[in-house]
UniProtKB/Swiss-Prot annotation:
Native source species: Microcystis aeruginosa (strain NIES-843 / IAM M-2473)
Record bears the keyword Magnesium: yes
Cofactor note: Binds 2 magnesium ions per subunit.
Protein name in UniProt: Fructose-1,6-bisphosphatase class 1
Organism lineage string: Bacteria, Bacillati, Cyanobacteriota, Cyanophyceae, Oscillatoriophycideae
GO BP field: fructose 1,6-bisphosphate metabolic process; fructose 6-phosphate metabolic process; fructose metabolic process; gluconeogenesis; reductive pentose-phosphate cycle; sucrose biosynthetic process
Cross-referenced PANTHER family: FRUCTOSE-1,6-BISPHOSPHATASE-RELATED, SEDOHEPTULOSE-1,7-BISPHOSPHATASE, CHLOROPLASTIC
Residues involved in substrate binding: D132, G133, S134, S135, N224, Y252, K282
Any one GO molecular function term: fructose 1,6-bisphosphate 1-phosphatase activity
Cellular compartments annotated: Cytoplasm
Length: 348
């Protein structure tokens, strides 16, 4: 177990014994079979995508096609930001002709993007949200990318990607990249959760924290209380509870990755419940909530839709949505207890 202190890398270590992301992944893979060694190269490509996106974001306001909307809507019916398009294309570009992945599936695309020349040898699928919280770009707040890796289980000759419609325990790796004051990559391949900070002078992600453990309980509750009257009564009951009791503080940035990173480091709970308008929630299971659930569970936390463990949910379509309750074990259980209690009272 490690204490979740702020990231700090001694200056002298950068010259001598720093651990880069690629080196760390290779060390993690020593206990894996030889078939899994491609994960190191895949993680390096994800890191490259993160570097390219971070560079673009650093020039927001100084160059065209970074801020604002494209005027189009995506498969979710949402207005598309210019950075959404750029980031999605970056992920596709860095994996083309890599021989590593056969498919890329993104919340920005109706169907997976196939790379035929990779398919004979690329045994993996990359699932990702290229830019989470893209509305924050125009006001210079943090945004992020979310990713997960799954092993392809059939030839998918009809292009329907049915093998992706399985629970989140089929993920073999997951993580996120947070673009803020520094660019941070957090990942897990099922051997703990590890964080890396991008050193711009080296162009490398450097290990900052290893084997991160989320506190069992934390002071943070993170949710958009502007939706209060659209929530189920159980979630309103929970919100009233934290308002009445000392020791809780609200933090919400509008970027899922930023809020989850705070919860991971400081403890607490993030909630994105269903609403009257969207009872199934807004967040996508295979691109957002399942990858984050994989990561948080690896850190000793808990994630559910309020009733069912998120990693046990089987979607019936690629863009399946789900509510999200995620964070410290005690805090997630508290939210779940309000939901269970309300359901019990409704049945009586």
């Amino acid at each position: 177990m490690v204490s979740n202190i702020p990231f700090s890398i001694p200056e002298h270590s950068l010259d001598r014994d720093c651990t880069t992301l690629s080196r760390h992944v290779l060390q993690q893979l020593q206990s894996f079979s030889s078939d899994a060694q491609d994960l190191s190269a895949i993680m390096s490509r994800i890191a490259l995508a993160g570097k390219l996106i971070a560079r673009r974001l650093s020039k927001a306001g100084l160059m065209a096609d970074v801020l604002g909307f494209t005027g189009e809507t995506n498969v979710q019916g949402e207005s598309v930001k210019k950075m959404d398009v750029f980031a999605n294309e970056v992920f596709i570009s860095v994996f083309k002709q890599s021989g590593l992945v056969c498919r890329l599936a993104s919340e920005e695309m109706d169907k997976p993007y196939y790379i035929p020349e990779n398919c004979p040898i690329g045994r993996y699928t990359l699932l990702y949200d290229p830019i989470d919280g893209s509305s924050n770009v125009d006001i210079n707040l943090n945004v992020g990318s979310i990713f997960a890796i799954r092993q392809q289980e059939d030839n998918d000759l009809d292009g329907e990607a049915r093998d992706l419609l399985q629970n989140g325990r089929k993920q073999i790796a997951a993580g996120y990249i947070l673009y803020g004051p520094s660019t941070i990559l957090v990942y897990s391949i099922g051997r703990g959760v590890h964080a890396f900070v991008l050193d711009p002078s080296l162009g490398e992600f450097i290990l900052a924290q290893e084997n991160i453990i989320i506190p069992d309980h934390g002071p943070i509750y993170s949710t958009n209380e502007g939706n209060f009257w659209q929530w189920d009564e159980a979630i309103r009951d929970y919100t009233r509870y934290v308002h009445r009791h000392d020791g809780y503080t609200a933090r919400y940035s509008g970027a899922l990755v930023g809020d989850i990173h705070r919860i991971l480091m400081q403890g607490g709970v993030f909630l994105y419940p269903g609403t009257v308008k969207n009872p199934q929630g807004k967040l996508r299971l295979i691109y957002e909530t399942a990858p984050l659930a994989f990561l948080i569970e690896q850190a000793g936390g808990k994630a559910s839709d309020g009733v069912t463990n998120l990693l046990d949910i089987v979607p019936d379509k690629l863009h399946y949505r789900t509510p999200l309750v995620i964070g410290s074990v005690e805090d997630v259980k508290l939210v779940e207890s309000f939901i269970a209690d309300r359901r019990h009272r409704d049945r009586v």
